[in-house]
Amino acid sequence: MLLCRHEKPGKEYWLLPGGGVNTGESLVDALHRELWEELGIGEEVAVEGPVAIVDSISPVQSFAAKHVVHIIFAGDLGGRSLEAVNSQDAAVRGHSLFGLDDLDDVVLHPPIQRFVQRWRPGDPAVYLGALWAR
């Protein structure tokens, strides 16, 4: 599983590559753009999905509270090497490919480890509900 490392003061966590969708952009086009911006992967990646949808709703109700909808795709990097990856996104501090058995020890936002470990190609898309990682 390909993840991007992020940091906040005193806290390291991992996210799926991704971000917002620009006006007029399809979800798959946004996915390819984000792979380029965050990981320098310029070629189109074969994708399946969406495979899951997750809400991340901030438990703190305020003007700055967040509600992020994650639309998760599966993809195949086709044997691409990630050694020379250079992110254009200043928030991305690194990246790594994780084996499914290694995800239990990863601070992942949203916390979708169990879903990913159970998911198989061809499974129907699922709504995982509201998941918030602190």
Model-derived regions, located:
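N-terminal strand-loop-strand
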Residues: M1-L16, V28, E43-E44, L77
